[in-house]
Structure formats: structure tokens, C-alpha cells
Amino acid sequence: MAHKKAGGSSRNGRDSAGKRLGIKAYGGEHVIPGNIIARQRGTTWHPGLNVGMGTDHTLFAKVEGRVEFRAKANGRTFVSVLPIAQAAE
């Protein structure tokens, strides 16, 4: 009886597609209202001035201006949009 027992299929061999998270508009870049600044899971970056946060923690611009990242003493990084009038000064 030189039989080979039927081999079971592997439990591995699947992967999920990348979710395209991360910064979409870097510091110093010009944005308009509604532009997505960052996609994230949780609050890696926190919303600052003129930045809104969606239900999935996406950060977006509320006004036209320049993106600015600022680290605070508590270890949190805040993302703000400086309006064009302020950015020019």
C-alpha cells in the first residue's frame, strides 16, 4: 500500500491590500478647503487650526492656505493650515 494520504491545503497564502494611509499633503504645501492632509487609523496626527477630522480620523483642510506640522511638549503632533494672508507674512 504505497499510497500518499491526501494533503490538506495550507492555512496561509492570503493578504489584504494596502490601505494607502499616511500624509497626503506635507508641511509647506498649498491646500484648498476639502483637501485631504492625512489618512490614518487613530490619531497619529491631531487636528489643529483650520483642520477638520472625519469619522475615520482623516484630517482635511477647512480653509485655503499652507500646511504646518507642529509637535507639542506632550508628544502630540498637530496639523494646522495657515491661511494665505498669514502664510505670506
Swiss-Prot record:
GO molecular function: structural constituent of ribosome
Keyword set includes Oxidoreductase: no
Stretches the record annotates as Disordered: 1-20
PANTHER family, sorted: LARGE RIBOSOMAL SUBUNIT PROTEIN BL27M, RIBOSOMAL PROTEIN L27
Keywords assigned: Ribonucleoprotein, Ribosomal protein
This protein's encoding gene: rpmA
Any one biological process term the GO annotation gives: translation
GO cellular component labels: cytosolic large ribosomal subunit
Record's protein name: Large ribosomal subunit protein bL27
Family affiliation: Belongs to the bacterial ribosomal protein bL27 family.
Record flagged with keyword Ribosomal protein: yes
Cited InterPro entries: Ribosomal_bL27 (IPR001684), Ribosomal_bL27_CS (IPR018261)
